């Protein structure tokens, strides 16, 4: 092999490594402090939050403009659900994308208004089903309370 071919191969390898670390590689945070630092600056990172009853996986995808405001796009995935109804289990492994204001440190799933995707839709569906069941279970009581108001 000639020196020219070897140099071209070496340049391609270096370029490939640079592209990988720039656009694909996402460092993992092992603790909350690392995650909060990355979230505040919207630097690429992933973090698994074991909150006891539920395990969330977060992945910062980068900055984006949403409604002319700079936001940090975070992918949220529900990895495990240890408590709750059987219906809740259908949310496991679903994801949603959340637009967190730049510089704000918060759990993205706490403000679902800024999120979209199958996980958000599933959570909303569960809430509606639970509300519907509550109304069915208490229709007599609700009716008598409304009658007492008049």
Please name every model-derived segment.
Residues 6-7, 35:
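Intrinsically disordered, low-complexity segments enriched in polar/charged residues with Gly/Pro
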Residues 55-109:
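Mature extracytoplasmic domains of secretory-pathway proteins
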Residues 110-150:
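C-terminal partner/receptor-binding element of secreted or periplasmic proteins
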